[in-house]
């Protein structure tokens, strides 16, 4: 059975995470490179899931930062060859535990993300609920999804 670890990215893992995002969002999904790396990256906490049997290769990533009383989740990506194994869900669940416990997110009442519309079922399986209308982001339909953060005192 494969061994995976979910954790905050080290500086080296952050570089791998950026390369993974470019592969998934730019090379595969054809989003513009100049939109992928943005002004939120330096503000965000970046999480990765690594595969121990592959020299701790980064196989998935996401980022989170605060906007008012929301934890904004974004850039959720898993390498195609690792999709369908529950790794994205593990990444999101780990982030949820982090949001419940980290003082930096204490003011956040809920987590918010902009899901590609055709990926919304994944987030529904993670407990997120769609709110609002479908909107266009870079030519791709998206919808905002939310989940309450139950802080651990």
Where in the sequence are the language-model features?
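Conserved beta-strand in the GNAT
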Residues: 48, 56-65, 70-77
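A short beta-turn/loop motif at secondary-structure boundaries
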Residues: 37-42, 114, 136-137
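Conserved catalytic-core motifs of GNAT/GCN5-like acyltransferases
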Residues: 112, 124, 129-144
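Conserved acetyl-CoA pyrophosphate-binding loop and the N-cap/start of the following alpha-helix
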Residues: 82, 86-95
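A conserved beta-turn-beta hairpin within the catalytic core of GNAT-like acetyltransferases
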Residues: 66-74, 83, 105-107, 138-141
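Short amphipathic alpha-helix that is part of the acyltransferase structural core
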Residues: 1-35, 41-46, 50-57
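Conserved GNAT acetyl-CoA-binding A-motif
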Residues: 92, 99-116
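Conserved beta-strand segments that form the floor/walls of ligand-binding pockets within enzyme
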Residues: 63, 72, 77, 86, ...
